[in-house]
């Protein structure tokens, strides 16, 4: 709302028509408008580049609404987004005819709140509409582990969320079902050997969140499948 994008765009493209909206703008050059109520019918047949920093909302719900709305008429979408949009599950919000062209991590303290630096784990992505649909990455089939319930005599527990995400050991009884996965290792694999290799893996996906670290089953399987026996 303070024109961080607008003022730079006007310098770069002085001859282009630039519309700027915010529900509570800080400068006069930005019109007061709820973007999700913007009437795009008069411009939907033109080349439209949408650039901004949509509000994230709880579990990214608001920025997902912005993305879905933009996909109806945009040629490109360039947004600051929660870091969780590095995950394949979040990328699915974009229609399949949009292709990811750029994704970069923002520096720490990239935001300002009440005139103070504010850190929100975020990225900047550029998506472009094309005539072909992008390929959807399918979840991998697990090679070595089977997810089971705690009461089904699992071999190992794996921390699912929190500061110790992906911590894996044989302790089962004191582990919470809300914060852990429970797995059986396939019968032809030695559990101790698997555990040793597991604990050497680098699970980068666990850091792709705005809140506490976490890892999904598909993300876990993708990395565990790289183990070689």
Regions found by a protein language model. Give the residues of each.
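Class I S-adenosyl-L-methionine-dependent methyltransferase catalytic core
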Residues: 1-229
């Amino acid at each position: 709302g303070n024109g961080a994008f607008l003022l730079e765009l006007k310098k770069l493209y002085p001859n282009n028509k630039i519309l700027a909206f915010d529900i509570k703008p800080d400068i006069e050059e930005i019109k007061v408008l709820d973007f999700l109520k913007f009437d795009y019918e008069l411009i939907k047949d033109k080349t439209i580049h949408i650039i901004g920093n949509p509000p994230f909302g709880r579990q990214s719900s608001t920025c997902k609404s912005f993305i879905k709305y933009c996909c109806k008429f945009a040629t490109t979408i360039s947004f600051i987004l929660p870091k969780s949009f590095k995950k394949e599950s979040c990328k699915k919000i974009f229609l399949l005819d949009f292709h990811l062209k750029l994704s970069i991590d923002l520096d720490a303290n990239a935001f300002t709140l009440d005139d103070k630096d504010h850190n929100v784990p975020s990225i900047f992505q550029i998506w472009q509409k094309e005539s072909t649909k992008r390929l959807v990455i399918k979840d991998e089939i697990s090679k070595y582990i089977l997810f089971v319930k705690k009461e089904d005599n699992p071999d190992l527990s794996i921390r699912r969320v929190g500061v110790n995400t992906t911590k894996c050991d044989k302790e089962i009884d004191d582990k919470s079902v809300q914060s852990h996965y429970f797995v059986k290792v396939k019968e032809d694999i030695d559990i101790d050997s698997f555990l040793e290799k597991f604990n050497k893996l680098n699970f980068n996906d666990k850091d792709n969140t705005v809140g506490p670290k976490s890892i999904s089953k598909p993300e876990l399987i993708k990395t565990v499948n790289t183990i070689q026996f």
